[in-house]
């Protein structure tokens, strides 16, 4: 059910946080925090503190909201798909001041209408993606190796009318990882990053 799926989606970041935050080799360098009760009072802190605004819904799937604009107005460049209000943000600040990745809306709709997308091809040819998915079921994030099995299966196996990887997560994964590298390189350029932040605020 959707409620069951949402519960799993809550459990996964909590489990990832537990692993990452207890890894002494990266202590003090990175920390994963999962905010369970996202509300306006929490959002105000996040908008002001963020260096990057990640808006990563699958193109054509997200209603246009205002959260990404609030990040933008606080100087956080957008890392995201061309979906929802991200389209307007890129039009305003320019593609060079955002970090866009993933399938376009037209590509997503074409796959949905005409087929041709098989996440297993990606799984079988991209070792990094395969490793990430295997971590869902090999005990990396939970001693219960079945806890995230349904999530793993949903990405690779069609079940009844539920198409495998219906949100094209594996299709966007490599592009997302590359976008993260672009963010890292841009952030190291302090003046360039400050310019991006100011243009987003303006």
Q: Predicted regions: what is each one?
A:
Residues 31-33, 55-58:
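Short, flexible loop segments at the rims of nucleotide/cofactor-binding pockets, characterized by
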Residues 18-22, 52, 59:
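Conserved helix-loop functional segments at active or binding sites
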Residues 37-41, 60-63:
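Short acidic loop-to-helix transition motifs that present clustered carboxylates
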Residues 1, 34-37, 201-202:
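Conserved short loop/turn motifs at secondary-structure junctions
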Residues 9, 13-40:
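Nucleotide-activated donor-binding/catalytic signature segment of Leloir-type glycosyltransferases, i.e.
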Residues 41-49:
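Short acidic alpha-helix that forms the nucleotide-activated donor recognition element
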Residues 48-50, 56-197, 201:
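Catalytic binding pocket for nucleotide-activated donors in carbohydrate/polymer assembly enzymes
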Residues 1-10:
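Single conserved hydrophobic/aromatic residue that forms the stacking wall/gate
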